[in-house]
Amino acid sequence: MTRTQKGKTFLPHCFYQSLPPRLGWGMILNYSKLKGKEECASVSSVPMVFFSSQYRLHRKSQYLKMAAANLTFSQEVVWQRGLPSIPYSQYSFDHLYNTNDIIHTPQIRKARPQKPVSFKFLGSSSPLTGDTSLAVKTESSANPEKKLKKSKPASTVREAPRPLIHHPCMHPDMLGRPPSLDVNLEEREAWLLPPEKEARAWEATVLEKLNERTARWIQSKRPRRPGASPNKWQSFLRQQYDWSHIRDELTSASDLELLKQLEAEETAEFEDQSVILPPQEKKKPELLLPVYYRLPSYFQQAETVEIMPGNKSTEDIHEKTSLSQPQTQSYFRQVTPRAGKFAYSTDNTFEQEIYFDEVQIIHQIGAKRDQIVLENLNRYNKQLSKVFPETPEKWSAQAIPEASYRPVQGALRWTALPTPAKDMLLQVGEKDVPIKTRRLKKQAKSLQEDVTWELVVLRRMLKEWKTAWALIIEWHHETVENLLQSLGDLHDDVRIKAITTCATAALERPRIATSQRDSDKTIQDLPEVLLPALEAALCDKNAHVRMAAAICQYAIQSHNPLARNIMQTALLKGNSVDSWAAAQCLALEGTATYPVIKRILHQLFTKKNEDTEEQSYILLSYLSEKTTLIHTMLAVELNSCQWKNRIVACQAFSRISGNVCLDMKHKLIQLMWNDWNKEVRRAAAQALGQMSLGKEVHDIIRVKLGQGNSQERVEALYLIGELKLMTAKLLPSFLHCFSDDFTAVRRAACLAAGALQIRDKMVLECLLNLMQRDPYWKIKAFAIRALGQIGQVSPELTDLLLWAIHYEESPGVRLEACRSILALKLQGDRVRDTFLDVLLLENHDAVLKEMYQTMKILNLGNEGNQEMLQEIKNRIKTLSQKDLLTHKILKLEMVMGKVREEAKRVYLKPKGEQGPLTLQTLLQETFQDEMVLPRRPSEVCDTEAVIKPVKPRAPNPWLQSSVPGLTTRSKVRSSLVKDLRTSPEKRIAVGPFRSDYPALYLGKFSERTFFSPIMSSPSGKKGAHL
């Protein structure tokens, strides 16, 4: 063994030669057969011999078997390479909760004192290795579990594993620990074998290809120990990347100064030295589009810098700036630019909002005294002067509860203008507590947009175009710099999206003018910086980009001729989406050509929603003032075979303006009277009314209503209801239709009166007359409906409606009466009592449902005489029982028979002044002392149960004989079988007194036969007496 100058121990070279050769994956195998020194030397020194493939596979399999025979791994190796083989109970999840890799802390690597290298030999009797030791444990890996729990920060870089160093003069069965990593490369390379030197030759190649920054970074991770000689990395950096190599080639003084600055930056970066850099220009914050449009609820905030581990420059910037601090610099704004130097201008955000944007200040109860809250929820901190002596909250160590808000006399002086508060938004976990606000003396005027119809059309056009191409645009978060960069992007879709964002912002920005001063302000639709890029997009090689740029030019209303040419090309050759957008843009510009009108009419006749229909009508109405081509093309559609096209053409005539020729008037009148479709006739009549052609229609209706047949009168009345047309000349003929002989005419007159809602006395009298005296129930129902639509309430109408709902036989009339009461909102005790009475007797489901709904809406509660009504219902239910009614009827028959027999058989002397016996007196005397109690359900007689014993039994098929007509059991004659005897035979069987055979009375079984002896008792007595 030898000892070096530094006191480290090394083994002799002979011990190294006794070790077996290494495998490809860096593992040492100890062969028991190779024990001699010569054999070991021969293995390490003999050059490589190429064997056959089969022999190599055979040897490879033997090596694998021998290597895996008693192979064991340390715990640290298992944790690093064999995690799937570790049981779940032994696995540690501490590294999941380690935050060192999220927030990196710079660590300073301290030099450790040198320690002598000591070698420990593990004998063959080691419990881990057995006969052969295959694992090597160093002192640093003595406690692998502790090192695994303590995770390293992400900023540290692990050193690459170095090949195992073989030491000489070691026993073949022993494994030694490699020397310390701090040993110089020169000393380690002195005893390396040639194969090891060749294996390490890759370092020279790697060092040649490393750049300066990577080499210096590696050097910074392995700092030189104090007192030690410079290592190979430091010498490599000096030789490879020394600035003195290029210093002689520089000639200008500026280049030399730049070289010194670069050297100082590198020194500060890798040796932690502070360098005073020249002041740099502060980066100007990007301008948001809402800030450009001066929206009151937007203001710029300071730009935050992303922090990277180890980057001290960004950390210093982060320490100086705040995340929630608003911008410190703001552009100046003036009240009226025309005032020149006499106008007030300011760059304070608070003054700009309250003076220029006219945002009101909200005085909140319980708010902070040092803050100002505006209508847009922006908060500003007051810059107040200090108050002496200071309050206890400043110098007290204990927390003092916040007192309730109380008025304070006096006000503190402002030392500066208010600044935006940092806590503009609620902090995490803070609740938004509603605060009572004082009522302002003057209510703020509602802000309404001052938008022209051209702008509305452009907004709708752009919205439809974006929806068709599935473009989702959010312009409130875009900046001018970002849009300018996107306009020059390489990809077409990025340019299209940027152009569409510009067009959307120009059209959708708020246009609120609350005063004359605001109306004088001129804010361009887009910043001047973006206009050249947008104009350049008109010459883009992509057709979609050019189309988007043309739409943007029309959005800002620049009247660019190149954009007009693009739109005309898209109108003729483009797809349906682009051609429809082009037609709208060209129509807004006043281009009333045949292709534009044809495309608009095509979109109108194939419309899919109401917005498209409204857009088409607006454009056609605007173009109709410039040309008559629209009326000509619509007149062609009036002769279309499709009734829907005729309706659209009539509606278009009623919406557009312009002069209409006489032929079109006659065509519309013809459609109004003779078209087979009801909707077409209605649309034609409305078109004539909207086109100021009411006189011609009025004269025709007057003639047909007074001199036409029944069908013409019905059509005339229908048109009167549709057009809402009634004059003094039409009224006499209209009143005569209420008494017409035809039902259809009277029905049409009621419908027209309800549609016109005429409150004329004569019309109301005609409707009341139909309601009372018309023989057809439908006419009564239509008259009642017309009275409900007119809404004229009178006592006579109330009486007639209540009478109709109570006594009319037709359910339809009662239903319409109930609906008219609801329409007229009739209330009161009389109405409620009538409804309650009708509910007891009404049996129609529709009428009952309508009555319940009417009572619920009119709040006609069921309080009234509910107790009395319930008692009446219970009494009726009790008296309506079948057995009680049968008993009363039989008793009444018995009494009447007795009275009849007494009058026939017994002579009674008449009494003076005694009137004849009436039915009412007879009923009172018969049922005077009788009390009827309501029965329980169990006491009610079950008729089926009573009749069941006397019913004939059903034949049993198993007891019948196979021979038809023969049965095993004789048929039992029942008393319910029809008696086939004649009347003389029945009288002979009954006898002269009809009391011997009561069961044969009337020839059938009935309840009446049970009382026959009682009823025939007078005759029995008479027979006995005779």
Swiss-Prot record:
Keywords linked to the UniProt accession: Repeat
Q: Which residue ranges contain the repeat HEAT?
A: 530-568, 724-760, 761-794
Which residue ranges does the record annotate as region Disordered?
Answer: 135-175
GO MF term list = oxidoreductase activity
**Highest taxon, organism lineage:** Eukaryota
User: Which InterPro entries does this UniProt record tie to the protein?
Assistant: ARM-like, ARM-type_fold, HEAT
SUPFAM superfamilies, per the entry? ARM repeat
Stored PANTHER family: HEAT REPEAT-CONTAINING PROTEIN 4 (PTHR12697:SF20), PBS LYASE HEAT-LIKE PROTEIN (PTHR12697)
Q: What is this protein called?
A: HEAT repeat-containing protein 4
Q: Which organism is it from?
A: Homo sapiens (Human)
Lineage of the organism: Eukaryota, Metazoa, Chordata, Craniata, Vertebrata
